Amino acid sequence: MPRLRRAEQVARNRDLLLAAARRVFLARGYAGASLEAIAEDAGFSSGVVYSQFGSKADMFFALLERRIEDRASQNERIAAEFAGADGLRELMRVAQEDAAAEPGWPYLLAEFRAIAMRDGELNRRYAEAHARTVDGIASVLESLYKPIGLEPPVPVRSMAEFVQAGAVGIALERAANPDALPDRDVEQLLLRALGLLDTAVASSGGGRRR
């Protein structure tokens, strides 16, 4: 196998480090994780880690940004195919699959948010990342209304903030009570809150874009 060019090697190392960071952060939490533990998980020296990331916070934000981008692309694909209530249901279905695959992510995010609240610079950086998340959700929600000729009952930005806050809150509630807020109830609550209940389509695929 030919040797990787330096730029390719740097990119490969970064991917491996971020994969290791995800594992360590999810297993130990933000406070319990360290760059040394992440380096060990990835099979690298600490020097390789510090050549890519200046701090644990830098690594966390890189991981968060990648997650934001991945989820935004995923949601955009769904919104391009579905509209109305069916679009919301499909977004929820995929979000539930993601949550099942990484059940610790909402707890990690909540932990980091609590830490960032007490650190002005961390809070500023987190607020910027959070705003991009909300912007992406707002854009996708807006696209659910246009094909069915409806106007959102409240500004889509407020809807997006409500949805994002609810997702983290539901995860935390279920940590204390796994039976809290069944998915079917959450679906009905969101359909009502977003003014999409009357657009619910009984037939399979009825909400696909034509």
Task: Indicate residue ranges for each PLM-predicted region.
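Generic hydrophobic, amphipathic alpha-helix propensity
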Residues: 10-21, 38, 63-67, 71, ...
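Hydrophobic/aromatic-rich alpha-helical bundle segments in the mid-to-C-terminal region
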Residues: 123-127, 145-210
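Solvent-exposed, amphipathic alpha-helical segments
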Residues: 20-28, 74-77, 108, 112, ...
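Helix-turn-helix
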Residues: 16, 20-58, 62
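Residues at secondary-structure transition points
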Residues: 1-16, 54, 58, 62, ...
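Hydrophobic alpha-helical connector segments
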Residues: 62, 73-106, 152, 156-163, ...
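Short loop-to-helix capping motifs
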Residues: 55, 115-120
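Amphipathic alpha-helical packing segments from all-alpha helical-bundle domains
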Residues: 72, 77, 101-107, 120-147, ...
